Design a protein with these regions (language model features):
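S-adenosyl-L-methionine
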Residues: 114-162
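Conserved SAM-binding loop and adjacent beta-strand
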Residues: 58-74, 82
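N-terminal auxiliary segments of SAM/dcSAM-dependent transferases
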Residues: 1-51
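Conserved class I S-adenosyl-L-methionine
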Residues: 83-94, 155
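C-terminal substrate-binding/active-site "lid" region of AdoMet-derived donor-dependent transferases
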Residues: 170-233
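Conserved SAM-binding loop of SAM-dependent methyltransferases across substrates and taxa
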Residues: 95-106
């Protein structure tokens, strides 16, 4: 178990028995710490103990690239109905945000990452998320193992060769299973749609993910003009 220690806008991940050293003082997380406890440093400042949830892990995971945004994860779960007990095959682990979220809702996940260093980071992130026993991070190319992979409820892809895997979706998925392809470019989405058609998948849709925060002040209310609301494109299809 890893806890989030919170003081104002400061947050730190620590496990029981580990020490936290900041300018606010030093403290050691007790072995019997529980969410809601207040821990005091030797200088008298307090930190509140929280159990990390998905958004906290997104903020604190070590990153190996641009991770999937929580809004994209939400769409994956919403469009596919991913749930506890599902078997998920994921390719393009990266930081492991999607794999961790799916593991935390109770799915059993097998995720492939080609880069050995990225895979090692993802395994540590799974440990921080508490899903190291249900998320199997494998180093390698999923296309090399497709002949031995079957019986999955959900196939999620964030790789350049995703269309190649989409064509094999009928061999990988159970009847009624879903495949989701995340692509940063429209061309990748088009290729995924064409591959889904070639594989006789149904209910094929593509969605651009855009989110805008709202700004409220004395002058009025409007969408925040800072930042970029667009993240990418999600193509969803189903095997009958």
């Amino acid at each position: 178990m890893t806890f989030l220690l919170v003081h104002g806008d400061r947050e730190y991940l620590r496990a029981p028995g580990e020490e936290l050293q900041t300018d606010l003082g030093v403290l050691t997380v007790p072995d019997d710490a529980e969410p809601g406890d207040r821990l005091e440093t030797h200088l008298g400042d307090e930190f509140v103990v929280r159990e990390p949830r998905g958004p906290d892990l997104f903020d604190h995971f070590e990153r190996t690239g641009a991770p999937m945004m929580p809004r994209d994860v939400g769409l994956v779960v919403g469009f596919t109905g991913a749930a506890a007990g599902d078997r998920v095959l994921d390719a393009g682990t990266g930081t492991g945000v999607l794999a961790a979220y799916l593991g935390r809702i109770g799915a059993d996940v097998v995720t492939y990452e080609r880069d050995a260093e990225f895979a090692a980071v993802a395994r540590e992130n799974m440990r921080l998320a508490g899903v190291e026993t249900t998320v199997d991070v494998r180093t390698g190319d999923v296309t090399d193992d497709l002949d031995t992979l079957a019986g999955f409820d959900l196939l999620t892809l964030d790789t350049e060769d995703a269309p190649t895997v989409v064509r094999r979706a009928p061999d990988v998925l159970v009847s009624g299973g879903f495949v989701v392809v995340y692509s940063p470019f429209v061309e990748g989405s088009r290729a995924a749609v064409e591959a889904a058609a070639a594989a006789d998948l149904t209910d094929v849709t593509t969605h651009e993910t855009i989110q805008r925060s709202m700004q409220f002040d004395d002058r009025g209310s409007r969408p925040d003009t800072r930042g970029v609301g667009h993240t990418g494109y999600l193509t969803v299809a189903r095997w009958e």
